[in-house]
């Protein structure tokens, strides 16, 4: 079944950057980092491509300004997820599965919390889906707020600087990389799919072991 046009657009990083610029990038990052129904949005490769487009001059903003805006969006998105989990988390766990919500995503994230503790708030920045649900689950378990914000800020900074910064480096030094955007997206999609499937299988294995 073909995806609706608006959903296809929201999952196309290149189109997001070319059409909406930094404003739309920030909105996507905000949503993907804390709104449970936005877990499918592009994250890692959107940040990398934002850096590439900034480095090649297609995205006409300075690198520091872009990093600051995306970092702020990531932190605020996770904060929103934390507050949602704290006040409405119980309703979310009782919510039936749908296209934009799967209970298995919460369980996968819960297993990461059991294994890594609060450090998952840093690790999860580089794990699609878990990145969306980690702050929500933090709120659900009433994680100490200053503790949450510390890991939120550190994780957000590492995620944005490493991905967008490396994208800028390649875009500035190798402008021709812009002709291989689709291959970059395919690479990130492959890594993302592998990571998500592996995380889900590990979570199921650990749940059965209990």
Task: Locate the predicted segments by residue.
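Transmembrane alpha-helical segments of integral membrane proteins
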Residues: 159-171
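Membrane-interfacial helix-loop-helix
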Residues: 1-27, 52-136, 140-143, 147, ...
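Transmembrane alpha-helix interface/packing and boundary motifs in multi-pass membrane proteins
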Residues: 26-47
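Hydrophobic alpha-helical transmembrane bundles that constitute the permease/transmembrane domains
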Residues: 129-133, 153, 157-160
